[in-house]
Amino acid sequence: MTGSSARAGADNRLRGTAVCSDGEWRYGVAVNLRSITYTSLARLDLDAADLQAIHATAQRENARRNITGLLIFNGTHFLQIIEGEPEPLAQLVENLRRDPRHRGLEVRHDTPIDERSFPDWSMELVQVSAARREARDTVRKRLPDGLPDGVRNRVIRMTEQISGTVAL
């Protein structure tokens, strides 16, 4: 699905260059970025149409807010990493907490970052098997080249956790 993801703006990778939440380009301005990782439990009757709607809305709205990230779904649990400026991220997390399509949203990692791990993905969706090994292998293949080892390892470890073989 990498080719179908909305592009968040490759110029955003350049240090000191960013699209801010007001949509204005600012050069030479230090941009305050954060990365938030959360997990949640999907509604029992969530179907493929619901998942597609979540993905399409996330791509559209995240591109508008200059939020990038990755959404992993294993049929029962979501694992999502979102990156962007603090205010739009806080608003998104509050919206996600109120979304009836999932419950039990738990922020597992929230940290300042110097640069985005997923600069080209307004929201990439990776659907994985509930089986640990298959889920891990699928995620490994889909993660972008050049992803920092710490981020790669966290995504793989948390994918294993939502796959039920490691306690959350």
Show which residues each predicted segment covers.
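Charge-rich, low-complexity N-terminal segments
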Residues: 19-168
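N-terminal amphipathic/basic-hydrophobic helices that include classical n-h-c signal peptides
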Residues: 1-28
